[in-house]
């Protein structure tokens, strides 16, 4: 499995191509910073993680407007998953959720998800940009 790491970078860096990824757009004024809080039924956790890993990797590799996909799970309860997602713009998000790889993830995991909260965030320092890179 590939390691996914998170790094901070300037808006100029956000436009550069990182190893294994397409060139990234800079965050626009209407960009999205979101925490997706997901609770997965325990019996589906392993299967869910396969879907989530695939959609994250494909999104970062192929979608210029998907800037960050960083998933973590709770140390005490691994069925509680939080994903930090950043999108360059509202349009980039619309393109992401319409993509074949996202639809495969969404339809394939509907029965696995016990609860979902989408929590949009406001950056404290908009000059800081987040971007992922893959090794």
Where are these regions (language model features)?
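Bacterial N-terminal signal peptides
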Residues: 1-9
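N-terminal start-of-chain detector that recognizes signal peptides
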Residues: 39-45, 53-58, 66, 89-93, ...
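Short, well-ordered beta-strand segments in beta-rich or mixed alpha/beta enzyme
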Residues: 31-39, 68-97, 119
């Amino acid at each position: 499995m590939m390691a996914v790491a998170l790094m901070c970078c300037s808006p100029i860096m956000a436009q550069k191509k990182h190893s294994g990824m397409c060139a990234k757009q800079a965050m626009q004024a209407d960009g999205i910073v979101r925490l997706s809080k997901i609770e997965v039924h325990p019996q589906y956790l392993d299967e869910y993680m396969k879907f989530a890993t695939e959609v994250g990797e494909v999104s970062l590799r192929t979608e210029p407007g998907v800037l960050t996909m960083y998933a973590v799970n709770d140390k005490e309860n691994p069925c509680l998953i939080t994903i930090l997602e950043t999108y360059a713009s509202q349009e980039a998000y619309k393109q992401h959720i319409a993509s074949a790889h996202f639809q495969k993830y969404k339809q394939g995991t509907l029965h696995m998800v016990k609860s979902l909260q989408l929590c949009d965030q406001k950056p404290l320092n908009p000059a800081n940009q987040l971007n992922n890179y893959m090794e």
